[in-house]
Amino acid sequence: MSTHQTHLKQLEAESIQIMREVAAEFDNPVMLYSVGKDSSVLLHLARKAFYPGKIPFPLMHVDTNWKFKEMIEFRDQMAEKHGFDLIVHKNPRGLEMNISPFTHGSAKHTDIMKTEGLKQALDAHGFDAAFGGARRDEEKSRAKERVYSFRDNKHRWDPKNQRPELWNIYNGKVDKGESIRVFPLSNWTELDIWQYIYLEGIEIPSLYLATERPVVERDGTLIMVDDERMPLEADEDVQNKMVRFRTLGCYPLTGAVESQAQTLPEIIQEMLLCTTSERQGRVIDNDSAGSMEKKKIEGYF
């Protein structure tokens, strides 16, 4: 076995141990399933952790109504194929207000449809622990977050008051209304994720693979025209370009990257040469300085 396979096996074992710990320790856990590559790895690990039994907690997708069409199709296919319990939540207040990233802006859209929607769903079902696919290498505020991330009864995160984590010992004590966000992939990198997907044969949305797609360049970001709701500016033209996505979210807020990588080995090769963050295409990360940390303090993923 190669050195890197051993490294991946160590990461796999750590993540599985965290999942089993949460399943044993908490009364009502849930896995946040956002349909991307990290969620796909989380799902695969959960199936391994509890095999041959069924995953002992539901998966939940907070749907903003603006996800890529392929993401929704892939989500439903995975739920049918693997038979897991799937909860889909859309913020009814946001739907009633017809919140849109085009008319209301990325910050308000994210706050109402993602953050508020997530908090609504967690409260409605009384979940005391929620798995997420965040990794420390993604973004600076996530780099300092614990594996067990304590949230108060308003789902707020206090980065200055985090619990110590010694080795693999985690403190899951919560009072009524409080909860823990759990990040089993904290120590994985983007390259680890792609190599694991390749070695384990994990299914992912084809949006991650390069092909010709209709895109518009807006403020330096390539936005894919995924449906008829996208308004075009007077000076904008839709062009077919060879692009793929390094991260997935709401299509108006997720930039594509020009790429020729059409297979997993080609993506891995691209990762070895890449010098930019995968979240460079996330419009919401550029709302203001420290915007991700502010969102997490308010209850974001």
Curated annotation (Swiss-Prot):
One of its GO terms (molecular function) is sulfate adenylyltransferase (ATP) activity. It catalyses: sulfate + ATP + H(+) = adenosine 5'-phosphosulfate + diphosphate. Keywords: ATP-binding, Nucleotide-binding, Nucleotidyltransferase, Transferase. CDD domains: Sulfate_adenylyltransferase_2. It comes from the Bacteria. Pfam families: PAPS_reduct (PF01507). Gene3D superfamilies: HUPs. Belongs to the PAPS reductase family. CysD subfamily. This is Sulfate adenylyltransferase subunit 2. It comes from Shewanella woodyi (strain ATCC 51908 / MS32).
